């Protein structure tokens, strides 16, 4: 028998199919099913912690990392009076309290997270700095060539806090940084960028 050829790729909701043909006789074929893909989901909110949300605040929950063929089929709230959710994943804090948001996929996989609506603003507890282009975390020391640019991106925890990030350089002659987090290496030396 020859090598396997995929006739239909597997998805999260449907098995795939592969076949191989007899290399000697040319006519005989063997077909086999390919297992469905394992359903997966990633959210831009923590599923293992309570997500704080200010009263009347809205936040867009984003879904990513779905296996081929899968999609979100429903968003539901355990208590719409406290937290409402649209069919696109936008949550809104309507009343002080807690509610669970449930996301169901076509494959049957579900994800849940708890939202706690509070009167006061959501305070930032920590933040991380990333390279906006590569989305990789920035190390404490970064080497740059003269003329090179690096754009910073700050991610706050919790994601529902709304901090205003500012950037400054200890030596603008060596490395300057603008209000959008773009660092420009000016000349050889060391400078500290503060966020």
What are these regions (language model features)?
Residues 1-39:
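Extracellular modular ligand-binding repeats in secreted and cell-surface proteins
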Residues 15, 23, 37-195:
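Extracytoplasmic soluble-region selector
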């Amino acid at each position: 028998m020859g090598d396997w050829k995929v006739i239909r790729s597997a998805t999260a909701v449907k098995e795939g199919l592969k076949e191989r043909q007899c290399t000697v006789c040319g006519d005989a074929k063997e077909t086999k099913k390919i297992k469905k893909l394992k359903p997966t989901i990633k959210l831009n909110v923590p599923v293992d912690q309570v997500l704080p949300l200010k009263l009347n605040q809205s936040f867009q929950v984003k879904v990513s990392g779905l296996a081929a063929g899968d999609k979100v089929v429903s968003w539901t709230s355990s208590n719409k009076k406290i937290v409402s959710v649209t069919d696109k994943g936008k949550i809104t804090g309507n009343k002080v309290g807690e509610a669970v948001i449930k996301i169901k996929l076509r494959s049957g996989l579900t994800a849940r997270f708890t939202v706690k609506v509070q009167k006061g603003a959501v305070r930032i507890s920590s933040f991380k700095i990333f390279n906006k282009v590569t989305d990789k975390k920035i190390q404490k020391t970064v080497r740059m060539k003269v003329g090179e640019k690096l754009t910073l991106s700050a991610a706050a925890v919790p994601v529902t806090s709304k901090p205003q990030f500012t950037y400054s350089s200890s030596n603008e002659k060596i490395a300057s940084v603008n209000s959008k987090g773009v660092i420009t290496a000016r000349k050889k030396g060391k400078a500290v960028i503060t966020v």
